[in-house]
Amino acid sequence: MTLRVGIVAAEPSGDVLGAGLIRALRAARPDIEFEGIGGPRMIAAGCVSRFPMETLSVMGLVEVLRHLRELLAIRRALLDHWRVERPHLYVGVDAPDFNLTLERRLRQLGVPTVHYVSPTVWAWRPGRVKTLRAAADLVLSIFPFEGDFLAAHGVAARYVGHPLADEIRPVADPAPVRARLGLPTGGPVLAVLPGSRLSEIGAIGPSFIGAARLIAARYPGLRLVTPLVNAATRERFAALRAELAPDLDWLFVDSAAQDALPAADVVLTASGTATLEALLVGRPMVVGYRVHALTYWTARLLRLVQVRHIAMANLLAGEGLAPELVQGECTAEKLAAAVAGFLDAPQRCAEIGRRYGELAARLRRDTSREAAAAVLSLIEASRGD
């Protein structure tokens, strides 16, 4: 009997996770069919995507409100479809604000549900753990410190490691990657990663470009490289660069961040998966982030944020190895100064690379295989196999 799995991812990092899970499940059970929402990697792995993944890629309270009607319509359409064509299991890949409601309603219909990537309930809006407990039969956790928190709140969870740690290894010598990208093997290289969402690029792109201009003026011969995941983000960031810094020698690469990061001496990045990728490659980073002022002050006033750091590298380390410049601190001048603090201190960079290597080793678990085994066990238990 063919197994049908519903699956939804909302952004590029989720697309990577979802694609790995699909491939691992199909390796174990070739008869499984997948449909829902996914990006190019999930589609290539065999998922039928009923809506473009980009329609779900919005962030922040204000930004979500602007797209709320469309988001609700998509979720309603998926639920209506799966009421008729009921899947044997549903996997929500991250995107908790979209997926948890869908999971809860499908679970009420008797569909076993998995949430792949624990929401950061230990860091942000901890009250969501009740929603998570009601929505998911099983949470697949990708960070080692999450399990104790989830267990204490009655959430069934399994730590599966992080798939990027299986895929990305430290790169000590940047020369081969620079040669492949057409960059000179000598001289400083700064990787600039302004985020994977258009709203992120609009919010922090100008500050990042301003910082790049200041750094280039201080370090003659500096080269800039920016990997961009899709045409929309490339077009948005390229337009900002053309407006604010048309004279800078800047290489845009149509690829994942991990393909360009090893070429860099230092990384200037938005908060998000890119901070983990920089850690896995072993590159020091400066993290900048800014959201709509209403989003930020609402979070502050309601005490929705529970942790000291926003960068995963710092959360894993338990200390601020990567400087974090948030909201009003995220200025071109302060970002540039933080980057210079690394470019001027090779010994500091080497020590951070060593620490990042230790942290990366804790994340390597053959994640997709571990996740697939957990999913198949839940399917078998629900069917009485």
Predicted segment positions?
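Nucleotide-activated sugar donor-binding and catalytic core shared by glycosyltransferases
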Residues: 1-385
